[in-house]
Amino acid sequence: MAKKISDPNYKVIAENRRARFDYAIESDLECGIMLEGSEVKALRGGGSNIADSYAAVENGELWLVNAYIPPYEQAKMFKHEERRRRKLLVSRKELANLWNATQRKGMTLVPLVLYFNHKGIAKMKLGIAKGKKIHDKRETEAKRDWNRQKQRLLKDNA
């Protein structure tokens, strides 16, 4: 499960809860996201989904691919495309680090959380991740079950 952003000034819009189950997250970073006006309004309304999306470095730019932002009903002429590619904003140094990380075998960029920061600006937390094998997923699930059982036993004995 993704870590909750502890500051109450942050408003989480969408969370990729499957990412921590399907991938081993090595590190994460915060980046900005270029949105159209109707997309910002739609995000404030809720209903967006980043579970099927990923990030890719192409031509020296970082892109978010296949993220769903629902249409904003009050936008008449300037409606946005729901699953269009959106540019992610990072510094050149971070972009170089991300590109180097994705060149290693099995590494990918996974969106973890989409949120508004304390200034009301949309931000995304990206994770540099490696896909887990089926036995790794089973192991993670077994550890989680064991931790639940330990907590239950401690609660019952106390």
From Swiss-Prot:
A GO cellular component term found in this entry reads: cytosol
| Sequence segments annotated as region (Disordered) | 133-158
Q: Which GO terms describe its molecular function?
A: RNA binding
Q: Does the keyword RNA-binding apply?
A: yes
Q: Where in the cell is it found?
A: Cytoplasm
Major location, coarse class? Answer: cytoplasm
Q: Which domain of life is it from?
A: Bacteria
InterPro entries, per the entry = SmpB, SsrA-bd_prot, SsrA-bd_prot_CS
Compositionally biased spans, kind Basic and acidic residues: 136-158
- Keywords carried by this UniProt record: Cytoplasm, RNA-binding
Alphabetical GO biological process terms: trans-translation
The family classification in the record reads:
Belongs to the SmpB family.
As for what it does, the entry says:
Required for rescue of stalled ribosomes mediated by trans-translation. Binds to transfer-messenger RNA (tmRNA), required for stable association of tmRNA with ribosomes. tmRNA and SmpB together mimic tRNA shape, replacing the anticodon stem-loop with SmpB. tmRNA is encoded by the ssrA gene; the 2 termini fold to resemble tRNA(Ala) and it encodes a 'tag peptide', a short internal open reading frame. During trans-translation Ala-aminoacylated tmRNA acts like a tRNA, entering the A-site of stalled ribosomes, displacing the stalled mRNA.
- PANTHER family the record matches: SSRA-BINDING PROTEIN, TMRNA-BINDING COMPONENT OF TRANS-TRANSLATION TAGGING COMPLEX
Stated name of the protein: SsrA-binding protein
The organism named in the record is: Ruegeria pomeroyi (strain ATCC 700808 / DSM 15171 / DSS-3) (Silicibacter pomeroyi)
